[in-house]
Amino acid sequence: MKTPITILMTLGLAVSAISQGKEMSLWPNEAPGALGQAPHDIPTLTPFLAPADNNSGSAIVICPGGGYGGLASHEGATYAQFLQKHGINGFVLKYRLGSAGYRHPIMLGDAARAIRTVRTHAKKWKIDPKKIGIMGSSAGGHLASTAITHFDNGDSKARDPIDRASSRPNAGILCYPVITMGKYTHQGSKRNLLGNNPPEELVNLLSSEKHVRKNTPPTFVWHTAEDRPVPVENSLLFASALREAGVPFALHVYQKGRHGIGLADKPPFKNVHPWANDLVFWLKEQGFIAK
């Protein structure tokens, strides 16, 4: 029989295994393009660092979904806790939204800054700067897809050391993502990102399937065939583009499941959706998790 002290110690270990760091602003002062100083005007990053005895040395920036109008916590902190359990340092990105008056390229700028921030502070967080990925669901998946198709090497002459770092992720994880701004898009996400009646040039620029190149990082993509708000064609289009460009990828399409299903579980993650275990297997293949 467990004593009360034993039970408390066990609970303490469980809590410490899922530790959340302090939310931090991506820019020390006002963010570029800020429309004000309210919380929704300040993009942030919240670290979920892996315990020292289970740190794989890899990191993933997580972009929650929400149609570019909100941020779903079950696609943010919950993902970070799951990754943390597997030794990956998760960083949940609070990016600026169309519902607060922001439009492209603000969101992509926030995602790029998040990648640069993790890379710049990699030593402090005991992270390999060559093992930093980005993950997103739904509209967050679109943001992640733009981050892996529109990146740069950084500005070597920048005064801010973070701006000198590359914004290229080393891996992409796209969960039932919005990919295209064309036929199969999610209209709410498109409107929040680009506004009403965007020019064709902008529609093409933000249709990620049109911008996959050889240097797009290896990507894990999954969707359900039953998804109606964001049709599976989005993932099929992106996987086809990855294949054509010769980029390593994994594509998983599951028959059942509503849009926005996430992990379909909560800590301690005993009954997650199969995609989560498929992702762990893929991350081992990429060297993000020890085999």
Predicted regions and their residues:
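Mobile cap/lid helix-loop segments that gate and shape the active-site cleft of serine hydrolases
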Residues: 29, 161, 177-211, 217
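C-terminal catalytic histidine-bearing segment of alpha/beta-hydrolase fold enzymes
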Residues: 37, 46-48, 222, 232, ...
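Short beta-strand element of the alpha/beta-hydrolase
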Residues: 56-65
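Active-site glycine-rich loops that stabilize anionic/oxyanionic intermediates
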Residues: 64-69, 225
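Primarily recognizes the serine-hydrolase "nucleophile elbow" in alpha/beta-hydrolase
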Residues: 113-186, 203-204
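Short beta-strand/loop motif that positions the catalytic acidic residue
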Residues: 221-223, 227
